[in-house]
């Protein structure tokens, strides 16, 4: 079976008092790194210089027809994108909708906010050459739904700032 590395829909929607706003769309431009060694420890933080990283539209994969950016097969890929927040005090929650193959860790401004079940427990360091414990297939391409991860306002208040913020994702495969 061919494995596909996908971030078809990592979408961070923020809920204000009277409406939803999408902060990161699935096909937004991302900076990404296919590592051959461990990236800098601050790669997922807002002030990290990612200008040497490659850039491409979201929907990363191996070229199965639904990818915005095609990459070579690898055990891991690191992604970053920025979004703006105005009036952080009005946010009540955020939702990350994730469709992925095989595992991921998501960060807001360097703070871990979500992790797939097939990686070591939350807040545990996962090296670039780590393979997930087992397979997880993306589901949107087959008519399924993405996973939803809710982040409450107390967590958002401690992670986000008014102005530019960074949403970063570390993606791992079960094998190459």
Give residue ranges: language-model regions.
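Sec-dependent N-terminal signal peptides
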Residues: 4-16
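Boundary/junction segments of secreted and surface-exposed precursor proteins
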Residues: 15-37
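Aromatic-lined ligand-binding clefts that engage carbohydrates, nucleic acids, or primary amines
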Residues: 30, 53, 83, 88-110, ...
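Surface-exposed, low-complexity/disordered Ser/Thr/Gly/Pro/Asn-rich loops and linkers
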Residues: 46-82
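Extracellular and analogous surface-interaction loops
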Residues: 80-90, 153-158
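Exoplasmic/lumenal beta-rich domain surfaces
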Residues: 111-150
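Extracellular Ig-like/FN3 beta-sandwich strand-entry sites
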Residues: 162-164
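Short beta-strand-plus-loop segments that form exposed binding edges in beta-rich domains
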Residues: 169-176
């Amino acid at each position: 079976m061919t494995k596909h590395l996908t971030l078809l829909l990592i979408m961070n929607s923020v809920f204000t008092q009277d409406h939803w706003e999408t902060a990161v769309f699935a096909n937004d431009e991302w900076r990404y790194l296919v590592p051959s060694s461990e990236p800098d420890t601050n790669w997922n933080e807002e002030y990290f210089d990612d200008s040497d990283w490659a850039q491409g539209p979201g929907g990363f994969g191996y070229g199965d027809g639904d990818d915005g950016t095609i990459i070579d097969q690898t055990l891991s890929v690191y992604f970053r994108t920025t979004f703006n927040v105005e009036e952080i005090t009005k946010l009540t929650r955020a939702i990350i909708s994730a469709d992925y193959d095989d595992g991921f860790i998501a960060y807001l401004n360097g703070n871990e906010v979500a992790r797939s079940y097939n990686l070591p427990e939350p807040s545990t360091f996962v090296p670039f050459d780590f393979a997930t414990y087992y397979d997880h297939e993306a589901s949107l391409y087959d008519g399924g739904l993405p996973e939803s991860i809710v982040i409450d306002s107390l967590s958002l208040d401690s992670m986000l700032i008014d102005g530019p913020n960074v949403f970063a994702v570390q993606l791992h495969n079960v094998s190459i």
